[in-house]
C-alpha cells in the first residue's frame, strides 16, 4: 500500500502517543545529602598520575619579553628524554597552509619533583612585528606537536590595550579558579595580557606538582594565547630548615622552570622581579616576599625608582603580592610602606595591583585629592578571609566571600578599571583621566555595581572563624 502524506501523519502521531518506559537509572533524581564535607585542595585522588609528564607537550605558557611588540618567551614541559625540541612560528592566516614555519630550538633543563622527572623547555622568540597575529606550536617526543596556538604581539605606543588582573588563585584551582578565568575571557575578548599577583598555588605536602597541574588546567584558555605575567607570592616560596634558628625562605622549584621572564630584575631578586613595556604602559613586577623576609626591600625600591624614572610610557602599573595597605585583619606590611610606598607616590604610579589578603579592597594614596596611585587588592580562589575594621573605614569598595577578576582598558589619556565577580556582575569601576604631569583625576562609576558583599558565615566548615571559606 502506498504511504500517502495523510497516512504518514497518522503513523507519526501513533508513534508519539506510544508510552515510553525509561530504565530507572536514566531518570535524574535529587539525592538527599548528608553533612557538607570539606573539599580537598586538589581533585587528584591519592596515587593518581594524571599530571605525570608525557611525550606530548603540556604546561605551555607564553610570557612577555622586555619589548612584547617584538617578541615573547615560551615554556613547556615533556617527559624526560626530550632534549632541545623545536618551536615553530608563522604569521597566522586564514588558510591551514601556514607556509614555511620559522624553527627555533629550545633550551632544556631536567626537573625532578615529587618522584616525577620531567624536562622543561624554554624559547625566546625575537624579531617579530608589532600588532601581528602569530601561530606557534611546540614539540614533544617522537614527532608529537602541540596544537597550533595564536598570539598577537603588542602594538606600538598610542594603541589601546586591554588586560586582565587576577588576585590569588592558590587553593582548589581546578575546582574553583577555572570558572573565574572563563568568565574573565567572556568580558575581555581583546585582552592581550593576564597578570597574576602571586600565590598561584598553595604548595607543600607532597602535592606541589599536582597543584601546578591544576593551575595550568584552570588557566589553559589564556596561558598560551596571551602573555601571562606572574608575580611571586609567599606560597611560591617554601620554608627551609623550618622551626630551627636557620629557618629561611627559599624560592620554590617550579618558578624558574615554569616561567621564562625578562632578565632585567632588581639586584638580589633578579629571578622574581622584572619590567616590560606594552603599548602605552610600563609594567613593573616586584617580589614582596623577598622584600619582607630576605632583606631586599631597599634594593628593590632603588631599582623600582630607576625603572620608573627612565620610563617614557604614559601609564605605569606596579604589581606586588603583599599590599601596601592590608585590608585583612592582623596584617601590616610596614617595611613595604617604608621603602616601596615613597617610590610609588613620588612617581604617581597609576595602579598598584596586589593580592595576599583573600578579600577585595581599593583605596587611594595618602595624598589628599590625588587620583593616583590607586591601590587594589583582589582574590580569585576559594580561600576567603575577613576584612579588618580599618579596611571598612579606609577602603571603598570592599568585599568578603567573593571571587573576582579585573579588566583594565587603556586608551590614550583614559584608563578604565572594572572588577567583576565570578558570575560577571560588576563590583567596582572607575576611570583615571588626564596626564601624570598635571595629575590624573579619578572618576567613579557607581552605576550598575552590585551592593557590598560581606561574609554571612560564622566560621568555615573546618571551624575557622578568621576565614569565610577554605
Put a short name on every predicted segment.
Residues 122-124, 133-150, 209-312, 339-340, ...:
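Extended active-site neighborhood of metal-dependent phosphoesterases/phosphodiesterases
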Residues 93-120, 163-179, 202-204, 246-247, ...:
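Acidic/histidine-rich helix-loop elements
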Residues 290-293, 311-351, 370-371, 386-389, ...:
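Active-site-proximal segments of metal-dependent phosphoesterases and phosphodiesterases across multiple
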Residues 2-11:
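Bacterial N-terminal signal peptides that target proteins for export
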Residues 80, 169-172, 200-204, 234-238, ...:
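Solvent-exposed loop/turn segments at secondary-structure junctions
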Residues 165-167, 194-199, 228-234, 287, ...:
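Active-site neighborhood of phospho(di)ester-bond hydrolases with catalytic His/Asp-centered motifs
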Residues 15-18, 22, 26-165, 186-189, ...:
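Acidic, histidine-bearing metal-coordination/catalytic regions of metal-dependent phosphoesterases
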Amino acid at each position: 500500500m502506498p504511504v500517502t502524506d495523510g497516512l504518514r501523519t497518522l503513523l507519526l502521531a501513533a508513534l508519539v502517543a506510544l508510552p515510553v518506559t525509561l530504565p530507572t537509572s536514566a531518570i535524574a533524581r535529587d539525592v538527599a545529602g548528608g553533612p557538607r564535607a570539606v573539599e580537598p585542595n586538589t581533585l587528584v585522588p591519592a596515587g593518581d598520575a594524571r599530571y605525570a609528564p608525557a611525550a606530548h607537550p603540556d604546561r605551555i605558557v607564553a610570557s612577555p619579553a622586555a619589548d612584547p611588540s617584538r617578541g615573547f618567551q615560551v615554556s613547556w614541559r615533556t617527559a624526560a628524554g626530550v632534549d632541545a625540541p623545536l618551536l615553530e612560528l608563522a604569521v597566522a592566516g586564514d588558510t591551514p597552509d601556514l607556509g614555511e614555519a620559522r624553527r627555533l630550538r629550545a633550551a632544556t633543563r631536567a626537573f625532578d619533583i615529587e618522584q616525577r622527572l620531567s624536562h622543561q623547555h624554554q624559547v625566546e622568540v625575537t624579531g617579530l612585528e608589532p600588532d601581528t597575529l602569530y601561530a606557534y606550536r611546540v614539540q614533544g617526543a617522537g614527532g608529537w606537536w602541540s596544537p597550533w596556538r595564536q598570539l598577537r604581539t603588542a602594538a606600538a605606543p598610542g594603541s589601546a590595550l586591554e588586560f586582565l588582573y587576577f588576585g590569588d588563585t592558590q587553593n582548589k584551582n581546578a575546582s574553583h579558579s577555572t570558572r573565574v578565568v572563563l568568565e574573565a575571557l567572556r568580558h575581555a575578548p581583546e585582552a592581550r595580557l593576564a597578570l597574576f599577583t602571586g600565590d598561584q598555588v598553595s604548595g607543600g605536602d607532597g602535592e606541589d606538582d599536582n597543584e601546578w597541574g591544576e593551575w595550568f588546567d584552570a588557566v589553559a584558555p589564556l596561558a598560551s594565547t596571551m602573555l601571562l605575567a606572574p608575580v611571586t607570592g609567599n606560597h611560591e616560596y617554601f620554608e627551609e630548615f623550618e622551626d630551627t634558628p636557620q629557618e629561611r625562605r627559599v624560592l620554590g622549584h617550579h618558578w624558574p622552570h615554569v616561567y621564562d621572564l625578562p632578565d632585567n630584575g632588581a639586584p638580589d631578586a633578579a629571578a622574581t622581579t622584572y619590567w616590560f613595556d606594552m603599548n602605552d604602559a610600563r609594567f613593573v613586577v616586584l617580589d614582596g616576599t623577598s622584600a619582607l623576609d630576605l632583606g631586599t626591600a631597599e634594593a628593590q625600591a632603588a631599582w623600582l625608582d630607576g625603572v620608573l624614572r627612565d620610563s617614557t610610557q604614559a601609564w605605569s602599573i606596579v604589581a606586588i603580592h603583599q599590599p601596601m595597605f592590608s585590608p585583612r585583619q592582623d596584617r601590616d606590611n610596614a617595611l613595604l610602606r617604608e621603602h616601596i610606598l615613597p617610590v610609588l607616590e613620588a612617581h604617581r604610579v597609576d595602579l598598584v595591583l596586589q593580592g595576599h589578603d583573600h578579600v577585595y579592597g581599593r583605596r587611594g594614596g595618602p595624598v589628599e585629592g590625588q587620583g593616583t596611585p590607586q591601590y587594589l587588592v583582589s582574590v580569585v580562589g576559594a580561600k576567603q578571609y575577613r576584612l579588618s575594621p580599618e579596611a571598612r573605614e579606609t577602603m571603598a569598595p570592599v568585599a568578603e566571600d567573593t571571587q573576582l577578576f579585573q579588566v583594565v582598558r587603556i586608551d590614550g589619556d583614559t584608563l578604565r578599571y572594572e572588577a567583576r565577580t565570578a558570575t560577571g556582575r560588576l563590583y567596582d569601576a572607575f576611570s583615571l583621566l588626564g596626564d601624570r604631569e598635571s595629575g590624573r583625576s579619578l572618576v567613579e562609576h557607581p552605576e550598575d555595581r552590585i551592593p557590598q558583599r560581606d561574609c554571612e558565615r560564622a566560621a568555615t566548615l573546618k571551624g575557622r572563624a578568621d576565614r569565610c571559606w577554605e
